[in-house]
Amino acid sequence: IITSTVKSTLMGMKTVEQIGEALNFKNISTLTVEEHDEMIGFLSQLTHCIAVSLMTCKESSDLVDYTGDSFRDLTRIARINENMWSELFLLNKEELLLQMNLFLERYFK
């Protein structure tokens, strides 16, 4: 994902795209800051919040022998660098809260 800011130049954006192509990136997209924040808020940050919530809402040490791949995936996601995630959540707070509210609206329907 290439995100343009007010400091970005066309040449700089093209250079970043060419680097992605040289590295054989499968998808190279240019998004606005708002599009990026919305997508990351939903796909990454909301997912992380849900994973952490599931890992902390119930003592699950006695359930370890019964877990499947999806639960193990959630524990892996929940354990990722909490200091980094805290900073990312604060930087994208408004969008993350919006995504949480949308999720909860659908959940309770």
Name these PLM-found stretches.
Residues 62-109:
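Interdomain hinge/lid region at the active-site interface
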Residues 1-77:
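Internal alpha-helical scaffold of NAD(P)-dependent oxidoreductase catalytic cores
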